Structure formats: structure tokens, C-alpha cells
Amino acid sequence: MPQLIWSPQALLDVQRLYRFQAHKNQDAVKRAVTAIRQSVKVLSLQPGMGRPVEGMDNGFRDWIIDFGDSGYVARYRPEAEKVIILAVRLQKEAGF
């Protein structure tokens, strides 16, 4: 089973999302972070489940995480014995 690794950027993204939404509803943002962390765990069991990222090679994939009105997207790259979470964004964010 591949090891799940969070890149420093992905960890910063989760912190940024937390800070951005914490003033609105503390309980909801805690549930969102938990949903993100729980959802990506499946990638260590089935790393090819996400959708391939168009225009990018090297196996980059996006994993859709449903939550609330929109949800999140985790960009990741599966490798031989690891799955690297590269970034996490709101689905509504541009440029991802």
C-alpha cells in the first residue's frame, strides 16, 4: 500500500482554507478539514481513482472532495510507493 504524503504546500493550503473560513463557522471548518483528511486516505488504497489533470503530464490527478455547497479539490501525484498530496483548493477557486 502506497504511503500518503502531504507536501508542505498542501499543508499550507489546508491552513489557509481553515483561516479563510474559521470566522464564518468554526464547527463547519473543522468538519471540512476532517473531511479533506479522511477523503484523501482512499488514495493510498487506490491511487488511480482521481481524474487526470488535462495539460499536465507525469500522472498528476485531481481528487474531488464533496463538502457543503462546493467542496474541495486535492491535486496529487501517485508514485511507486507513495501518493503525494501537492495542493488543496476550494472547487470554486480559479487557476486549479
List the predicted regions and their residue ranges.
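Basic, Lys/Arg-enriched alpha-helical interface segments
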Residues: 1-61
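Enriched for short, Lys/Arg-rich terminal
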Residues: 21-23, 67-96
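Basic/aromatic recognition patch in beta-strand/loop cores that engages polyanionic ligands
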Residues: 47-81
